[in-house]
Amino acid sequence: MIKGLYSAVSAMVMNAVRQQTLSHNIANLQTPGFKQILETSGGFMQGQAVYTTGNLNGSPIEYVGSMGLGSKIGQEYIDFVQGAMQKTDNPLDFALQGGGFFTVQTPDGNRYTRDGRFLRDSENTLVTVDGFQVLDDAGQPIELPDGEAAVSAEGVISVNGEEVATLGIGVFADPMTELQHTEGNLFTGPDASTGEEVPRVAQGYLEMSNANPSQLMTQLVEVARSYEAAQKLVQNQDELLGKTISSLGRIG
């Protein structure tokens, strides 16, 4: 009986966490460069189930398998699959085709991002929509003279036909293990690239979220139903436990 209560409560907790993650992914469906969060699930409090024909002190015990008391969220990880490309025709919108991340400077140090919504600030420095400076391949802020900016597929930025900088693009052999999410669309990781892929830069495009809206909504409905079922099971177990305690009281 108590085991059933453990299982139901753990299912409620797990589904509450899953609902929070799914809601976060849904809230960022329109965020350029967003990488959805995925989760694994596993059991907890695993034990051995035994079978005996009589007294535990004298009868042989046969192990029949393992028994868990519920489920829990196992591991949370970032899905780095590339999102769809959306054309904007904004000359300072950049998207990366393939692997790689733009390098930006924040108050907490350098960070990596796939969000290519860039702007000129009041000092003609290339910055993100959050005001972080975009860095070149030497780790320096990119200064843009007045004029029309263009970027090549290799990331070379030109203004009025003259080269001014090359985008600092970090490439990683295994971003899932090498990068850690910090906040928003930012990641921290090694100072130098570890991968050999050469991404292509597309000007006038943005990479959109890699989350699938219809899939997320389906999962959200499934989680809500699972939570409701577990909640009803907790209520049933609670009622049954109450009746059992009441019966034992009458026997005494």
Language model features: what each stretch is:
Residues M1-G252:
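Amphipathic alpha-helical polymerization modules
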